Amino acid sequence: RTLYHYSDISIQKVAVVTDGDQAMARELGDNVKQFLPHIGEQADWQYVTGDQYHNVNDLLKIMAECNPDLIVTFRCLDESSLVPQHTLGVYVDVMTQTLSTPILLLPGSAQQPHPLGTRACQGVMVVTNNLAGDDQLVNHAVACTASKSTIWLCHIEDDVLFRRYLEAIGRI
């Protein structure tokens, strides 16, 4: 079994991605700085707005150019015609599959964001399909939380493997 090894992660560049304008992106960035005060002002904050990309490939190129340590965004970017319930949206879905950069997915969606409030982050959920041996993702979660916060580690299985587990449990 691979053991977890803590490493202090320094988040130097944060990309705030929104489908709105520069004012909306900066306001969101200010809210995230309050939410993540230990990253706050020490990081270089870059703002990517809806007029800078028109499709997923455009956004991927921008992310490659700015090379952030953390991407902050909402579900369902640039999908105002949809009423999202159980989807990340095309942009976030592709970014999670093609980029190695951790993504801080904010509550709500781009069309209906939930306010972060004025408190610092008290809990982070790490979601991946292969958590074992992924120290970097867990260390990024630690970097986003204050002391005495909670981190949930969520391992997602595909349907085939999940059914196999259920069958094995059923035989016990």
Positions of predicted regions on the chain:
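Residue-level detector of flexible, active-site-proximal loop/helix-junction positions
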Residues: Q52-H54, A110, D158
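Gly/Ser-rich helix-loop-strand patches that form or flank binding pockets
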Residues: L60-P115
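Small/aliphatic-rich secondary-structure junction motif
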Residues: R1-G50, A120-I172
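Amphipathic coiled-coil/heptad-repeat helices and related helical stalk/stem segments
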Residues: N55-V56, L88, D134-V138
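Charged docking surfaces used in two-component/phosphorelay signaling
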Residues: V48-D58
